[in-house]
Amino acid sequence: MDPSLSDRGHLLTEQANPASQALDQLSPLELVDLFNQEDQHCLAAVAQAREAIAQAIEYAAQAIARGGRLFYIGAGTSGRLGVLDAAECPPTFCSDPEQVQGILAGGSAAMFRSSEGLEDRAEDGAVAIAEYQIGPRDFILGITAGGTTPYVHGALEAARSAGAKTGFLACVPADQVAIAVDVDIRVPVGPEILAGSTRLKAGTVTKMVLNQISTGAMVRIGKVYGNRMVDVAVTNRKLEDRALRILSDLLSIDRQQAAALLGANERSVKQALLQHWTGLEPAEAAALLTEHQGHLRAAVTAFSSLR
C-alpha cells in the first residue's frame, strides 16, 4: 500500500448514509422518494451558509466592477458545475465571457470525459492561476465537495500569493478540512445515498450556491432591473421574444412598438427602456448608461433629478 495514501473515511462526503442501506433493494418509486427526502438537506445547508454566500457575492461583484474577474476552479463534478454556471452568464446577462470563467482540471476534454486523476496534482492548480494571469483584481472560488482536492488547494494558495481574493466551497465542515481563504462557504448536506458519489447532493447544493453567487453579482453590477434580465443578449428567437415581452410589460406598449424600440437601440433592452422613459436620443441614452456604469435605475434617477 502507498504510505502516502490518506484515509478519507472521516469526511462527511465519504461516509455511508444510514437512510440508504437498502438502496439496492428499493423499487423505482421508493428510490425517488429517498432522493427527494435527502435533497431537502440541500435547502437547509444553503440557508445556514447565507452570510458566507452573501460575502462571496460582494467579492464577485467588486471584482467585476473594478475590471477583474470571477473564477470558479475545481475538478470532476465540482469543476464542471463551475464551467456550467460561468457559461450561462453571457446569454443571461450579456456579460463579457471573460468576466465569469470556470477552470476545470484537465481542461475542456475533462468536461466530457472523466479525468479524475488530474485532481491530485496541486502544482497543476498553481499553473492554472499563472496561465489565467489571476491577480489582485480577481476573485477565485475553489470548489471541492470533500474539501481535500490538491488541484484546488494548489490553485488557491497560488491565487492568494498573487493577491487575489479567494473563496472555498465545500460540503464538509471546517473542522474536517481547514483552509485560509477570504470567504469559506460550507454546505454539509450529509452522506450521499450512494456513498461517496458527490455528484448527487453535493453537486445539487454546489449548483445552488453558484446560482446565487453569479446571479447576485450580476444584480449588484446593474445587469437587472426589478426582476427582469434587462441586459439579456438577444441572440435567438426565444431571447428576442423575452426582450420584447420585457419592453411590452415595463412600458405598456404592444409587441410591434417594442420591436421598433429595440431595433432603434441596437437591440439593447436596457438602452431601449431608458430611451423611452427619458425621451433621449438612443446615443444619449447609451452615454447616460455608460456614465452610471450600466445601472439602469441609477441612470433613470439621475435624469429625473435634473428635470
Curated annotation (Swiss-Prot):
- Pathway it belongs to? Amino-sugar metabolism; N-acetylmuramate degradation
Q: Which PROSITE patterns match?
A: GCKR, SIS
Q: Which residues form the SIS domain?
A: 60-223
| Catalytic activity, as annotated | N-acetyl-D-muramate 6-phosphate + H2O = N-acetyl-D-glucosamine 6-phosphate + (R)-lactate
* Record-linked InterPro entries: Etherase_MurQ, Glucokinase_regulatory_CS, MURQ/GCKR, SIS_dom, SIS_dom_sf
* Location of the active site: E88 (proton donor), E119
Biological process, per Gene Ontology: amino sugar catabolic process; N-acetylmuramic acid catabolic process; peptidoglycan turnover
**Superkingdom, taxonomy of origin:** Bacteria
In alphabetical order, the GO MF annotations are: carbohydrate derivative binding; carbon-oxygen lyase activity; ether hydrolase activity
Enzymatic class: lyase
- Which UniProt keyword terms apply here? Carbohydrate metabolism, Lyase
EC number(s) for this protein? 4.2.1.126
Question: What does the further note read?
Answer: A lyase-type mechanism (elimination/hydration) is suggested for the cleavage of the lactyl ether bond of MurNAc 6-phosphate, with the formation of an alpha,beta-unsaturated aldehyde intermediate with (E)-stereochemistry, followed by the syn addition of water to give product.
Subunit (UniProt): Homodimer.
Q: Which PANTHER family match?
A: GLUCOKINASE REGULATORY PROTEIN
Family from the record: Belongs to the GCKR-like family. MurNAc-6-P etherase subfamily.
State its role: Specifically catalyzes the cleavage of the D-lactyl ether substituent of MurNAc 6-phosphate, producing GlcNAc 6-phosphate and D-lactate.
Instruction: Quote the protein name from its UniProt record.
Output: N-acetylmuramic acid 6-phosphate etherase
Q: What is the lineage of its organism?
A: Bacteria, Bacillati, Cyanobacteriota, Cyanophyceae, Synechococcales
